[in-house]
């Protein structure tokens, strides 16, 4: 009766709810892992794996260091390029040699220089005498600016006269020439003094700057019979005077064969020009 009054006073007791023991209790109370425990641990392991698979794309964590990749791997483009360009340095190393070989004078050019070099130096070098055609050219230019026909031209006309001959003096060169003429020549020059001034400029021409006229003059020095071809006999005859020393038979034939491009045993004017213009 007292118990019923107590229940009525406090209300009916709620039905007891089944409670799950905590994981620690299950782990300590059972000697073996039950199915619920295994499922819970399995889900934790899967979570960890999913988190590790997300990597830096979902979090700001740094990517773990990786081992060295293969040279052809696409993940390392710089190494891929190096791997692809590996043989290129050897090829580029050969390029300068091929280029220098192309521009290096060959034996034919050396033979032509030995054969024609002394001749060109004697005819067109700095120590040579001016030829009749060059003197005529200087005379024509001088007379053009000798307007009063007294045999002199003034220093003011020297620059224009030099340009008529094909030279383009700088302002400093004109000042030096004008001062020299004014101080030592009374402000004007005659033809002989004009030749002394212009002669060195004409003598500075080299073999690769020669025109067709000069090349034909040089060719005629060797072509004694004027048949348009230089033979071994003509070379032997011209060698002492033009080359400064006689040449023996084997040396003459060897030089002629190196310069003879078409193999006919002689050197024509075209072969002569090609040998002198080759660098």
From Swiss-Prot:
Protein name per UniProt? Calcium-binding protein 4
Q: Does the keyword Metal-binding apply?
A: yes
Keywords of this entry: Calcium, Cell projection, Cytoplasm, Metal-binding, Phosphoprotein, Repeat, Synapse
What does the entry state regarding organ or tissue expression?
A: Expressed in the retina.
PROSITE patterns, A to Z:
EF_HAND_1, EF_HAND_2
**Region described as Disordered:** 1-114
Name where it mostly resides. cytoplasm
Composition bias of kind Basic and acidic residues appears in 1-12
Against SUPFAM superfamilies, the record matches this protein to: EF-hand
| Record-level Gene Ontology MF annotations | calcium channel regulator activity; calcium ion binding; transmembrane transporter binding
**Quick one: which residues bind Ca(2+) 1?**
146, 148, 150, 152, 157
